[in-house]
A protein has these predicted regions:
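N-terminal acidic, proline/glycine-rich, low-complexity intrinsically disordered segments
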Residues: 1-9
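Conserved helicase motor core of SF1/SF2 NTP-dependent helicases
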Residues: 59, 116-128, 133, 137-244, ...
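A short linear hydrophobic-aromatic micro-motif
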Residues: 45-49, 301-302
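Short glycine-/aliphatic-rich beta-strand segments at the starts of folded cytosolic domains
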Residues: 9-29
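Conserved loop-to-helix interface motifs that mediate assembly, gating, or partner/ligand docking
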Residues: 97-126
Length: 365
């Protein structure tokens, strides 16, 4: 880590720390137009950042400077390595350190799963790293979280990695062919034409992770299978890495059917977002399974959040806004139910007849 020396504070509230940067080109650390340093300033707006030569001076309150120094240390470590180094990495690192000061962003972001055509596929948040680690340590893993958190992409990367390492003999990618209220019978074309759009995201991800010329051969040989969930019924899947995507659109019966396909030497990753259920009626199999299998060994539920969104930064804010809206809507619905129940009780009490005197006529004590 870079060495740092305290400079005499200008007063009791402000202190300065000088970070000496060694072993890395300042151009890489600063980024184009000092973009990365500006990202540090955005992460710690109360800290003044000044760069001169290979020195970075951080000035501000003691706690803020210490946090900024820790972030700079991690960025220097990443700059020395082969980590994809951009302003998103700075933002992610700052968020990691804020949520868990004991974590090392440089270590988290350096864990490459695959390298394809010069591009490394790796976890980009702490939540993603814990998710990937869970896949390594458990036979069945559920990745539950909002859109853009890398649930399916990382699961497929782990599947390709397992195939390349000969840990499994084939990859099976599946998803229910129900989405956004559409029914297959009303869609034009053959069954293949109807199903293909639902599976297209899986094909696209495969072509990013593997040589596009190799993928069709593996599909033709059955080494990689991409099929709708209905095609899993009645099968036992041995020595396979199986990924079920969009699991929130499975019924409880379909989820049970799918999980019981597990054979010897196989692993399963189930991904979904319980806030995007497209089933016309009934409950989601993904929602139910979190309660049914919560205590079963060798099954892990990894929950990702808006902090793990790796698409445009606006996506995370959109997810948070919808989460807040849904929570407020549920609270309002609950309040209405309580008011309605109280009103019904009042009406019943108002309409209840007075108790009648049933003593015989002429009765005396």
């Amino acid at each position: 880590l870079p060495s740092s020396n305290e400079i005499t504070p200008s007063d009791d509230a402000i202190e300065s720390v000088l970070v000496e940067v060694d072993g890395v080109a300042m151009v890489r650390l600063l980024g184009p137009q000092d973009r990365l340093i500006k990202a540090v300033e955005r992460a710690h707006p109360t800290v003044d950042v000044a760069v001169r030569g290979n020195q970075i001076r951080l000035s501000g309150t003691a706690d803020a400077v210490a946090a900024a120094e820790r972030l700079v240390d991690e960025l220097v470590t990443m700059a020395r390595g082969e980590v994809d180094f951009d302003d998103a990495a700075v933002t992610t690192s700052a968020r990691m350190l804020k949520s868990d000061p004991g974590v090392s962003p440089a270590e988290v972001l350096s864990q490459a799963i695959l390298t394809s055509r010069g591009k490394s596929i790796r976890p980009k948040t702490l939540g993603q790293k814990l998710y990937v680690d869970a896949i390594d340590e458990n036979t069945i893993v559920f990745g539950i979280g909002p859109a853009g958190t890398g649930k399916t992409y990382l699961a497929m990367a782990k599947a390709v990695q397992a195939l390349q390492r000969k840990e499994v003999e084939r990859i099976i990618l599946t998803r229910p062919a129900v989405e956004a209220g559409e029914r297959l019978g009303y869609l034009p074309g053959t069954l293949t034409d109807k199903i293909d759009p639902y599976l297209r995201p899986l094909y696209d991800a495969l072509n990013e992770m593997m040589d596009p010329e190799v993928v069709p051969k593996l599909l033709a040989a059955g080494t990689i299978e991409v099929a709708p969930l209905a095609y899993m019924r009645g099968r036992t899947l041995n020595n396979s890495f199986i990924v079920l995507d969009e699991a929130q659109n499975t019924t409880p019966e379909q989820m049970k059917m799918f999980l019981t396909r597990l054979g010897h030497g196989s692993r399963i990753v189930v991904t979904g977002d319980v806030t995007q259920v497209d089933l016309p009626t009934g409950s989601s199999g993904l929602q139910l399974v979190t309660r049914v299998l919560a205590e079963v060994d060798d099954i892990h539920f990894a929950r990702l959040s808006s902090d793990d969104v790796v698409r445009h930064t606006l996506v995370g804010r959109i997810v948070d806004a919808y989460t807040k809206f849904d929570a407020e809507k549920q609270a309002a619905a609950y309040q209405r139910e309580q008011v309605d129940a109280a009103n019904r009780a009042d009406r019943r009490a108002a309409n209840r007849p007075e108790p009648q005197d049933r003593r015989p006529k002429g009765w005396r004590r």
